[in-house]
Amino acid sequence: MKTLVLLSALALLAFQVQADPIQNRDEESKIDEQPGKEDQAVSVSFGDPEGSSLQEECEDLICYCRTRGCKRRERLNGTCRKGHLMYMLWCC
């Protein structure tokens, strides 16, 4: 009888561990589907206070954190984080 209770507890624990990632993915998808939050501009700054050729080249660079692919002529420039979620950084 004790063995049956122990096996049942282990099975329930295994189901709970598998269910937690599914709940986290559901929360992420709810966040992803909110309109207006997907395309938020990100400020890009460089360390040299006097400026550099790289800074001059990227002066008009506009970047967005989003989960989905690029739009127009954007390209992937790295990752960004909003809270505990990681997103892709797309710049044009």
From Swiss-Prot:
Pfam families: Defensin_1, Defensin_propep. Keywords: Antibiotic, Antimicrobial, Defensin, Disulfide bond, Secreted, Signal. It is found in: Secreted. Its main location: secreted. This is Alpha-defensin 25. Belongs to the alpha-defensin family. InterPro entries: Alpha-defensin (IPR016327), Alpha-defensin_C (IPR006081), Alpha-defensin_N (IPR002366), Beta/alpha-defensin_C (IPR006080). Residues 1-19 form the signal peptide. One of its GO terms (cellular component) is extracellular space.
